[in-house]
Structures are given as C-alpha cells and as structure tokens.
Amino acid sequence: MEKAIRNFLSQESAGGILLLVAVVFAMLMANSPLSGLYQGFLGTDVQVRVGALDIHKPLLLWINDGLMALFFLLIGLEVKRELLEGALSSVAQASLPSFAAIGGMLVPAGIYLLFNYGDPVTQAGWAIPAATDIAFALGIMALLGNRVPVALKVFLLALAIIDDLGVIVIIALFYSSDLSTISLAIASVAILGLVGLNRKGITALTPYGILGLILWVAVLKSGVHATLAGVIIAFCIPLRAKDGSSPSEHLEHSLHPWSNFLILPVFAFANAGVALGNMSLDTLLSPVPIGIALGLILGKPIGVMLFSFIAVKLKLARLPDNVGWMQIAPVAAMCGIGFTMSMFIASLAFEQADPMYGDLARLGTLIGSFIAALVGYFWLSKVLPKKGVLL
C-alpha cells in the first residue's frame, strides 16, 4: 500500500504543477491580444459523421464531454478499487472520510446558496464549491514529502474519492435535461452488455472499449451528461481475474499519466481562461464568485471538520492512527481546492446561461482554490514534524 500511494502521489505532484502552468497560460491567452485566437480555437467546430450518426460540437465541448469522460473512467476505477479492497472497503475505514465528505459538500453548497438566494439563474451553481480536485489536493500534499503520515494521505485520498462519487451523483441527478428515450434505450442495452461481459468473467479490455464507446455516444445523445458513461464502464470492468491479476488496476495505471499530463491540463487550459478586462471589484464581490470562493475557503474546512467532529464524538467514526485534529484541520482546508472539478460543474451549471456567469464561476473557483491551496499547504507544513515520519 505504501508503494502504491508513493507512486500515485509522485505523479499527482508533477501533474499538479502542469495544471498550474495550463491555468496561467490560459489566463495569459485570454487577457492578451491573442484572446481572439484562444476563443476561436476553443470554438472550432468539430464534426464526426458515421452513417446516420452525426456529432457536431465546438472543440470546447469535445474536451468537456469526451476527454473528461476518460477522466471519470479513471475516477470510477479508483472508486471501485477503494470500495472493494482499499480505504473504503469496511465500515470502520470508510466512516470518517464519508462523514467528512458529506459535510464538505453540504456546507459549501449552503454558503453559495446563501449568497445567491432568490436568483434562479445563479442558484444553478450551488454544487460548484462542493467539489474537490483530487489531483491538485494530493499534489499539494505531496510537496511535503515523507513528513506527511500515510494515514493522513489515505484520509485525504478516501475523502476526495467519496467527494468525487458525490459529484457523479449530483451530475446525474441535477445536470441532465431534455432526455431522449431512444438514446437511453440504446445506453441501457450497452450497459446490459457491459454487465454481461463482467458476469461471464471476460477480462480482455477491447470488448469493454467497444461497448463503452457505444454507451458514450448514446449517453451523449440522451441528455444525461456523457462523462457518466466513463463511470459506468469503470464499474463494469472486473477488478480481479481468475489468475489474480487485475484488469481494472492495469487500466487505471495506464490512464493515470494520460489524465495527469494530458486530459486535466488540456481541460484546465480550455476552461480557465477568464478575461479580466471588464471586471471590477464589484464584479469580484458579486454573488457567484464570492459564494464559490467562500464556499471553498471557509465552507469546505468548516464542513469537513464539523461533520468529522460530530461523527467521532457520537462514536460513529474514529480518527486515523497517529493523526490528531491539528493535522485533520489543514487537510480539511486543502479540500477547498475545487479547481478542475469545480470548473467542470460550472460548465454544466451555466451551459445555457449568459457566458458572463461561467466566467464569474471560473474566477471564483480559481481564487478560492488558490487561497485554499496556500492555506492548506502552509498550515499543514506548520503542524507536521520537521523531519520525515516512518511510512
């Protein structure tokens, strides 16, 4: 387990730096004479036609619907592994991160709704500060090296995975519309095929890939967000083969570098470019960005700490071995790094609204995530031992 976590975090650290570079590059492009080129590139029409099938979208939506489906495939594989064999495989292990994740979603959402009360357009963004960017949060923690106890790393990993699971449910329930019965029927047949492959013990990934592609197209056309196809595919791929090997883990390890070094940086570059030219202090303090920023900076740590404390006091959960509240608190602050996940939800929440709302949401996400990262890093650095701990 130690080796797996070390390998995972070493990639997340490098990936987190690349994400930051992508965001800076996007902001520079959006606020320079190259802004027209930037917007034109993302708005480029890309069409795929095979017989009667016709998918016609701007490049930005191919990134958000296509590349991010692969990212959610990876998230689904991680969730399944942790539920069956990892940090969430028993009630005792899963209790504290589960309560923490629930609090870390409810309180930020409540803060956002408090600032956006009475406005049905902006209220659609309530889930934006509820998300945690697992890659960036773990990347920030990885900068502290072996000073961080393994139990604390596992707590953040488990919490972030449950948070991702919550985001998946939110997308399915609240950000799907104009459902197509025919497309849903085709998607259902594809899902039955995937389940059948699993039940028959098929471990070759090619059949899952073929049915998965059919499922993605059907879900894309159905009105349900296409990224959910990635999660469904992940849950159908067997965790263990008869010989003890793991097709699921093999695919997960193969996808990690693609996710960290291509998918997420490309997504960040495509979605983080906010033009600041027409924004004033009043704009920055308007309900959408202030609700998101405060939800991430204050709501996340308050929610995580409050629900964790209640769960421990009621003996529904216990703190990890050799970890105290002084170490949990800065990790709770790190959970406010919403970044790519928050921007992704923002793209769904304000997809049909004035583009201004999307810009405000991304700006609030960037400000909130940046402050949460700084606070979490320096706070955790302060409370950890100066020398490495035994892992």
UniProtKB/Swiss-Prot annotation:
Tree of life domain: Bacteria
Chemical reaction(s) catalysed: Na(+)(in) + 2 H(+)(out) = Na(+)(out) + 2 H(+)(in)
Subcellular location: Cell inner membrane
Entry GO terms, CC: plasma membrane
Keywords (A to Z) from UniProt: Antiport, Cell inner membrane, Cell membrane, Ion transport, Membrane, Sodium, Sodium transport, Transmembrane, Transmembrane helix, Transport
Transmembrane segments: 14-34, 59-79, 95-115, 124-144, 154-174, 177-197, 213-233, 261-281, 290-310, 328-348, 363-383
Record-level Gene Ontology MF annotations: sodium:proton antiporter activity
Topology versus the membrane: Multi-pass membrane protein
A single BP term in Gene Ontology: regulation of pH
InterPro entries documented for this protein: Na/H_antiporter_dom_sf (IPR023171), NhaA (IPR004670)
Family the UniProt entry places it in: Belongs to the NhaA Na(+)/H(+) (TC 2.A.33) antiporter family.
Function per UniProt: Na(+)/H(+) antiporter that extrudes sodium in exchange for external protons.
Protein name: Na(+)/H(+) antiporter NhaA
Organism: Shewanella putrefaciens (strain CN-32 / ATCC BAA-453)
Classification of source organism: Bacteria, Pseudomonadati, Pseudomonadota, Gammaproteobacteria, Alteromonadales
